[in-house]
């Protein structure tokens, strides 16, 4: 058996911020849009985390409803969906279109989704039933409205797929169920298919070859791999097997668990973010954990019953780390929000399980 690998990652770029962003939108040119809970401004960054512009776009959180920002694949349009409206601006933040709707309830809301050719955009608004709308962008006309099964019970997240005529709609309902839909569309038709095999799964991403989709568990379930385009289950990694590794985190009262995030970093390897703030590595083919990423400046510390850091093994009740969120960006790098208030980028080497 190959030895468990610890892979150190030096910081490539970092940007100190006054507060961690409520949302990070990854742009097609490798840059980013940041918005914040308590500030109305949006900051545009380039791929090196240098500021391009900063503008008041009223993108703050209101009544516990985040503003969700989406950019079109050609970077010409920006969509902002908040508590009471969906807005579209140009790439400089100038308003082009606005759709007002009833307020979302606390912690609900919807993102937006642009088609690959920037011909259409989709969003959900709260009506008697939450309704999925398709907007034709050439004249800003809503051409489809599809009532969904719930009303003010879900948040709505969109994900692109390798097929430009299909996308995914995820509907997490707080601490309750998570449902995933596959949406197919043409210029004049749209269908929704519930993917029941993905119930209570958190959407991850597609492998770079476009053949496999990964999901993280909502609670104690397994990490799942699904084929594409069939979306059939091809593999599962139960958490008890993922964490069956000989390491130093055995003293906590509750064991480590997956923290809602599993992401492909290449065609052979996926990353699993854990409750203890760890970045575990697993092999796509054997579904075994073989290593851990150690990003520079991101520590995992032991805590005692009072929530204070401790080095006394007999006092340890839990562990926690510095990583708040992580994503894989357009360049295949690791993008992290850090507990210090910094945004950090780490280059990822080519990583795969070693064979012996």
Predicted regions and their residues:
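A short helix->beta-strand "capping" segment at the edge of beta-propeller domains
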Residues: 1-20, 47-57, 308
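Repeated scaffold domains used in trafficking and secretory/extracellular systems
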Residues: 16-26, 60-71, 104-114, 148-160, ...
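Conserved loop/turn motif of beta-propeller repeat scaffolds
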Residues: 29-30, 74-75, 117-118, 164, ...
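Hydrophobic beta-strand positions that form the internal "hydrophobic ladder"
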Residues: 32-33, 78, 120-121, 167-168, ...
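Structural motif
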Residues: 39-43, 84-89, 128-134, 174-182, ...
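Beta-propeller fold detector
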Residues: 53-57, 96-102, 144-149, 192-197, ...
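Solenoidal tandem-repeat scaffolds enriched in leucines and small polar residues
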Residues: 119-208, 215-219
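Blade-level signature of beta-propeller repeat domains, shared across WD40, Kelch, NHL, RCC1
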Residues: 320-356
């Amino acid at each position: 058996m190959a030895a468990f690998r610890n892979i150190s990652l030096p910081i490539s770029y970092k940007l100190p911020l006054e507060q961690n962003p409520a949302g990070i939108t990854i742009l097609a040119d490798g840059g980013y849009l940041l918005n914040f809970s308590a500030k109305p401004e949006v900051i545009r960054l380039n791929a090196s985390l240098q500021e391009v512009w900063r503008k008041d776009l009223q993108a703050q959180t209101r009544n516990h409803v985040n503003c969700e920002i989406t950019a079109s694949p050609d970077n010409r349009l920006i969509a902002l969906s908040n508590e009471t409206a969906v807005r579209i601006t140009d790439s400089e933040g100038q308003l082009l279109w606005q759709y007002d709707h009833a307020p979302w309830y606390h912690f609900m809301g919807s993102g937006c989704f642009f088609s690959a050719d920037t011909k259409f955009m989709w969003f959900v608004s709260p009506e008697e039933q939450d309704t999925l709308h398709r907007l034709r962008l050439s004249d800003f006309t809503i051409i489809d409205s599809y009532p969904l099964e719930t009303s003010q019970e879900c948040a709505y997240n969109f994900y692109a797929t390798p097929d430009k005529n299909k996308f995914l709609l995820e509907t997490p309902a707080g601490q309750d169920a998570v449902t995933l839909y596959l949406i197919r569309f043409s210029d004049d038709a749209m269908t929704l298919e519930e993917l029941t095999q993905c119930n209570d799964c958190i959407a991850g991403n597609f492998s770079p070859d476009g053949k496999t989709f990964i999901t993280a568990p909502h609670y104690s379930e397994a990490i799942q791999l699904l084929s594409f385009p069939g979306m059939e289950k091809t593999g599962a990694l139960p958490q008890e097997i993922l964490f069956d590794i000989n390491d130093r985190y055995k003293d906590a009262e509750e064991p480590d668990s997956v923290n809602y995030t599993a992401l492909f970093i290449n065609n052979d390897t996926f990353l699993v973010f854990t409750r203890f703030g760890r970045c575990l590595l697993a092999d796509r083919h054997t579904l075994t954990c073989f290593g851990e990423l150690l990003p520079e400046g991101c520590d995992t510390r032991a805590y005692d019953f009072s929530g204070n850091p401790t080095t006394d093994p007999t006092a340890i009740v839990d562990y926690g780390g510095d990583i708040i969120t992580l994503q894989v960006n357009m360049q295949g790098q690791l993008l992290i929000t850090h507990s210090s208030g910094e945004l950090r980028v780490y280059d990822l080497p080519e990583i795969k399980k070693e064979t012996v």
